[in-house]
């Protein structure tokens, strides 16, 4: 079961043009799309429209449209071929856990535990409070860390103030959880009204015995890994999962920060319990060697991704050739076995001794029977002749003796 089958996550039955839904132009930039989405999501959120049955469907439509236009790859596919291209790619939706009932949340938690990739959105309540500027922001000085626990579908906000020198050197903000909690690391930009709009978000990933997420503002392109892409590729074609392993690599939108105070937040993404975390802000000046290593490894991974794309083509050709040769081997083996069998059958026909078939006897069998019969007759005749000769011998012997005896007596 995929995430898009859960309540509040399925695509609208009658799909409208995403640009039309969000009221933006075809050439709208990312910021314009984000701003339009935030306004419409807050306007149609079901929690704020309990008496409006149409609001829930409109909210789904807005979320569905944003999921397309906020993703560069999906947006490109849609611009080229419409919804058909997205359907072919098996696009998944994100779900808002705060909009799910207890039963659906339990199902989501179960399937997530089984390894099904389920994307979640930030609660509309959190986004609204941030936009209204009513959130509590705690200071997080560079070079320090803060630990805490955040309730599910809630967020803890932190203000990171950086100097000109620190901004030039680069800044890193990371969150880890030794309890392996699910969370999101959020980055907000301040708008003209004094509120905060969501600009970036990073999903936690399991790395070793902890879960972690980070944002790296180091003045060069840094990438995030979307493991959902890998999971979906593995589900579609397990044999090609390896080749898609680096396809989830996506560029981070912001690569540097200006001097000033920047707002980050840790969002609790567990299904039921609180999320434990430690957030820290670092200046890259003291991690120059590590920064260079990261820059180098990112470049190597990008090259390897291109190499894998080419190698997959070669592998597919070789695999097809191997399958072809294997099939021919089986066919050739069967042909050779059949030819040798026919050869043996032909050899066996060169013989006067043939296998009986039904009630008909072969010539060889008849000759043999007649020969045996003749042999039997000869044996009987021989036995009779021998008896007569023995009788004659006896008579002759007795006659000789008798004649001799008569002479002597006489």
UniProtKB/Swiss-Prot annotation:
Keywords: Chaperone, Coiled coil, Cytoplasm, Cytoskeleton, Endoplasmic reticulum, Golgi apparatus, Membrane
One Pfam family linked to the record: DnaJ
GO CC annotation terms, alphabetical: cytoskeleton; endoplasmic reticulum membrane; Golgi membrane
Disordered, as annotated region: 351-410
InterPro entries associated with the record: DnaJ_domain (IPR001623), DnaJ_domain_CS (IPR018253), J_dom_sf (IPR036869), Plant_DnaJ_domain (IPR052812)
Coiled coil: 284-344
Top-level lineage group: Eukaryota
Protein name: Chaperone protein dnaJ 15
Species of the source: Arabidopsis thaliana
